[in-house]
């Protein structure tokens, strides 16, 4: 992939928890947004109060939980991703 998130941005591949709903078809517009994903790439960091670059705490491959309305949904190379700020990440699964 030829892309790189900037600053404190994180590229996340959402994990869709598709649950069986019997024979009821739920349209995409009514489905819950995923709030869990796998970190694909991280930006170089953010500037702290002293002007220094502080690296991000998450790393490629981390499974994370993020806020429901975080980030921007994008499609790269026919795959769905979300670009979020590190501050929108609530948990890192260990």
From Swiss-Prot:
The family note in this entry says: Belongs to the GroES chaperonin family.
Q: Which domain of life is it from?
A: Bacteria
This chain's protein is named Co-chaperonin GroES
Q: Which GO terms describe its cellular component?
A: cytoplasm
Q: Which PROSITE patterns match?
A: CHAPERONINS_CPN10
Q: What start-end ranges are recorded for coiled-coil regions in this protein?
A: none
Alphabetically ordered keywords of this record:
Chaperone, Cytoplasm
Please give the function described in this protein's UniProt entry. Together with the chaperonin GroEL, plays an essential role in assisting protein folding. The GroEL-GroES system forms a nano-cage that allows encapsulation of the non-native substrate proteins and provides a physical environment optimized to promote and accelerate protein folding. GroES binds to the apical surface of the GroEL ring, thereby capping the opening of the GroEL channel.
Which residues are connected by disulfide bridges in this protein? none
Which GO BP annotation is one of this protein's? chaperone cofactor-dependent protein refolding
Mention one GO molecular function: ATP binding
Task: Reply yes or no: does the keyword Cytoplasm apply.
Answer: yes
Q: Where in the cell is it found?
A: Cytoplasm
Any keyword Glycoprotein? no
Q: Which SMART domains match?
A: Cpn10 (SM00883)
Q: What does the subunit section of this Swiss-Prot or TrEMBL entry state?
A: Heptamer of 7 subunits arranged in a ring. Interacts with the chaperonin GroEL.
């Amino acid at each position: 992939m030829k892309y790189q998130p900037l600053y404190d941005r994180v590229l996340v591949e959402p994990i869709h928890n598709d649950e069986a709903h019997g024979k009821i078809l739920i349209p995409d517009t009514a489905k819950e947004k995923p709030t869990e994903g796998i970190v694909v790439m991280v930006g170089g960091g953010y500037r702290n109060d002293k002007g220094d670059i502080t690296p991000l705490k998450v790393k490629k491959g981390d499974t994370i939980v993020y806020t429901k309305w975080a980030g921007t949904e994008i499609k790269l190379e026919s795959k769905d991703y979300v670009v979020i700020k590190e501050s929108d990440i609530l948990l890192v699964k260990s």
